[in-house]
């Protein structure tokens, strides 16, 4: 039986497999195909971001790196986007899924709650475990996707996955 793999030309040229999640774009980014069609890679959003979390990524398109800091939702990136690739009216501003990786200190039986301490939305809570260290749980409905927890984690044990 013959199997075929469906790779878009862009994904193939960028070395991404169909299972690789899309990069995290600045808040208010249109859906990926429309974003790529409108973004002129002018770098205005990169240079205007006061937190320094937007960088020139693959193909010159802007991406967000939460390891550099959190998004304060100041929307300056949207304000300077003349080509319409970022829109303040898009809701939600982005759809991110946060994952706690195995290298999390709490998962390795070391008491650490840094991520919860910096989460203004209180989307991270630590669930007590009988005879064990409390482990983090993320409430996706409460999480704003600001990335403060990612920047603060001493083990880089949180990752954000973009969805659409």
How does the language model describe each region?
Residues 1-164:
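Non-ligating segments of multi-cofactor redox enzymes
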């Amino acid at each position: 039986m013959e199997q075929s793999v469906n790779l878009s030309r862009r994904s193939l040229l960028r070395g991404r497999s169909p299972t690789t999640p899309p990069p995290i774009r600045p808040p208010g980014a249109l859906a990926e195909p429309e974003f790529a069609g409108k973004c002129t890679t002018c770098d205005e959003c990169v240079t205007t971001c006061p937190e320094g979390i937007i960088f020139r990524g693959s193909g010159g398109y802007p991406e967000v790196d939460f390891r550099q800091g959190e998004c304060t939702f100041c929307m300056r990136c949207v304000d300077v986007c003349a080509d319409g690739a970022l829109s303040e009216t898009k809701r939600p501003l982005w759809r991110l899924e946060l994952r706690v990786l195995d290298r999390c200190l709490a998962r390795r039986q070391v008491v650490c709650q840094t991520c919860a301490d910096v989460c203004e939305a209180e989307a991270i809570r630590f669930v007590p475990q009988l005879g064990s260290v409390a482990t983090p749980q993320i409430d996706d409905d409460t999480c704003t996707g600001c990335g403060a927890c990612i920047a603060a984690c001493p083990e880089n044990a949180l990752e954000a996955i973009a969805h659409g």
